[in-house]
């Protein structure tokens, strides 16, 4: 488990490229037949990936000591979105088949969660977020058709995109976790521009569906102290509440967003005009 500490905006604006990447970029999400896990002190979110190829993978009790619990989801909820081939998630004996761009929400208290691929030649890739939970809500599979879609932007501003909200109050109840997958329209390269912050939630962006030579310039920082990170395929960026989070790609890409914090009102954000950015 990697641990990322919280960082003040006054400190962050003084960092060089290496420092920004060390604090905010998660460079490796997937490892074959294993899981990755990054624990952020910001709202206590956990971010990672699970890539079962030749065997099933589960997050065992080895993380219990680090989390101060007996097992991973004793006091947590989890959301996983599959960006690979068809896979299976078994939660305390209940099996869910999760295809590409399908998701599973797992409520607090699940003791055993196993991830596997149906075809090792086309393995599943489960990207997951986990947040502290105060009560147990039912496990639920969410397909792309069941997600709550919202199309924003315009071709003229190169930011037309469809936000597919998988884990939001309109689809299912959770304690605080929200997740979704945003697809850009052909020819659009910008996401979330004009940008925003939200004081009451933090967010993580996970970029994928990119070829080797594609990069996303991810904008971050306070609106009057912007910085950027160069992000490549299957990498994630931690965004504190004080930071904008927006990106532009050299070519097409897709991204998954996950939020935790004080509320789950999707529109609760502080919009920033482009003319106000520095």
From Swiss-Prot:
Keyword vocabulary terms for this entry: Isomerase, Metal-binding, Zinc
Cofactors: Zn(2+)
List of residues binding Zn(2+): 196, 198, 203, 245
Stretches that traverse the bilayer: none
Pfam families, per the entry: KduI
Calcium as UniProt keyword: no
GO biological process: D-galacturonate catabolic process; D-glucuronate catabolic process; pectin catabolic process
Pathway where it operates: Glycan metabolism; pectin degradation; 2-dehydro-3-deoxy-D-gluconate from pectin: step 4/5
Catalyzed chemical reaction(s): 5-dehydro-4-deoxy-D-glucuronate = 3-deoxy-D-glycero-2,5-hexodiulosonate
UniProt EC number: 5.3.1.17
GO function terms (MF aspect): 4-deoxy-L-threo-5-hexosulose-uronate ketol-isomerase activity; zinc ion binding
Database matches in InterPro entries: KduI, KduI/IolB_isomerase, KduI_N, RmlC-like_jellyroll, RmlC_Cupin_sf
Coiled-coil ranges from the UniProt annotation: none
General function of this protein: Catalyzes the isomerization of 5-dehydro-4-deoxy-D-glucuronate to 3-deoxy-D-glycero-2,5-hexodiulosonate.
Annotated family: Belongs to the KduI family.
Protein name: 4-deoxy-L-threo-5-hexosulose-uronate ketol-isomerase
Gene name of the record: kduI
């Amino acid at each position: 488990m990697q641990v990322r500490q919280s960082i003040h905006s006054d400190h962050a604006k003084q960092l060089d490229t290496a420092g920004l990447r060390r604090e905010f970029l998660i460079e490796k999400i997937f490892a074959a037949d294993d899981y990755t896990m990054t624990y952020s002190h910001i709202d206590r979110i956990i971010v990672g990936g699970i890539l079962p190829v030749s065997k099933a993978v589960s997050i065992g009790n080895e993380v219990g000591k680090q989390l101060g619990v007996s097992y991973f989801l004793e006091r947590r909820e989890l959301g996983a979105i599959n960006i690979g081939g068809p896979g299976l998630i078994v939660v305390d004996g209940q099996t869910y088949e999760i295809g590409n761009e399908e998701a599973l929400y797992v409520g607090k208290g699940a003791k055993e969660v196993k991830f596997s691929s149906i075809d090792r030649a086309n393995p599943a890739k489960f990207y997951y977020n986990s947040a502290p939970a105060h009560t147990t809500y039912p496990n639920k599979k969410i397909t792309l058709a069941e997600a709550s879609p919202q199309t924003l932007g315009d071709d003229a501003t190169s930011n037309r995109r469809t936000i597919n909200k998988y884990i939001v109050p309109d689809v299912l109840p959770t304690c605080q976790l929200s997740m979704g997958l945003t697809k850009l329209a052909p020819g659009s390269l910008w996401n979330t521009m004009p940008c925003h912050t939200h004081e009451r939630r933090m967010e993580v962006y996970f970029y994928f569906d990119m070829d080797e030579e594609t990069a996303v310039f991810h904008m971050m920082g306070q609106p009057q102290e912007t910085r950027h990170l160069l992000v490549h395929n299957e990498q994630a960026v931690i965004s504190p509440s004080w930071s904008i989070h927006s990106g532009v790609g050299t070519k097409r890409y897709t991204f998954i967003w996950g939020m935790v914090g004080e509320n789950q009102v999707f529109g609760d954000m502080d919009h920033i005009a482009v003319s106000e950015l520095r």
